[in-house]
Amino acid sequence: HSCFAGAVCSAGGYVLCDGKTLVDIPMEPQQAEGVRAALERHGVECTLEARDATFGGSKMTERWKFIHKKNDAPLNSEAERWRKAMEEGMSILPLSDYKGEPLYKIVFIADHESDLAEAKRLYADQFVFCESKLDRLTDGFVNGELINRKFDKGTGIKAICDHLGCTLADTIGFGDS
C-alpha cells in the first residue's frame, strides 16, 4: 500500500480504510441519552455527531455563528475548527431532526465549568471530558467534547496499521484537532 484512503473519525469511534469500515463503535443509546440529559439540566448546549450528520439546537448554532463572526479574536483549536467549518458552509441540522441515529460524539459549550459537574460525576468513568476554555471570547465559556473511553485516535490508527500490515512507525498522521 503505497497510497490509501483511510480516516480516523469521531476520535477513533469510526475508522475507515480502503473502503472498509474497521471500527464502528457509537455510544450506547442509554449512555448518550443519560449524559445528554445531565448536561442539558445545567443549561449546557450540545451538538450531536452521528455518522452522517450533526444536530444542534438553535442556541448552539447561534453561539458558533457568534464565534465565527469574531474571527479576529484568538481562538482555541476546537473553536477555530468550528469557525472554519461555519465559514466553509458546514450546516448543523436542527435538533428536532434527530431521530435517534447512533451518536459517536457530543460536543458542548457550557457557560461555566461547574455546569459540567453532574455529567462528570455520573459519566467520567465512560467518557473523557476534553475541555477548552473560551475565556478570551466571553465570560467563562468552556467548550469541548465527550470521547468514549472504549477508543481513542491512537486505537483508530492502530486498526488501520493492523489492516494494512504495517507498524505505527510507518505512519504519518494529520488532522483537524
Regions flagged by a language model, labelled:
Residues 12-13, 175-177:
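Active-site metal-binding loops of divalent metal-dependent hydrolases
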